[in-house]
């Protein structure tokens, strides 16, 4: 749920450990 929506990954994903995702969809 982190590659579909850049905000969705913050809500329901174990990747919330690091806010900067490995994919360039989330520049923050």
From Swiss-Prot:
Taking the record's annotation, the residue ranges forming a coiled coil are: none
Q: Which domain of life is it from?
A: Eukaryota
- Gene Ontology cellular component terms for the protein in this record: cytoplasm
Bias (Low complexity) occurs at: 9-20
Keyword list (alphabetical) reads: Seed storage protein, Storage protein
UniProt KW Nucleotidyltransferase keyword = no
Show the GO MF annotations.
nutrient reservoir activity
Q: Where is the signal peptide?
A: none
Region Disordered, annotated ranges: 1-28
The protein in question is named: Omega-gliadin
Organism whose genome encodes this protein: Triticum monococcum (Einkorn wheat)
């Amino acid at each position: 749920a982190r590659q579909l929506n850049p905000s969705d990954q913050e809500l329901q994903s174990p990747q919330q450990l690091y806010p900067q995702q490995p994919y360039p969809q989330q520049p923050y």
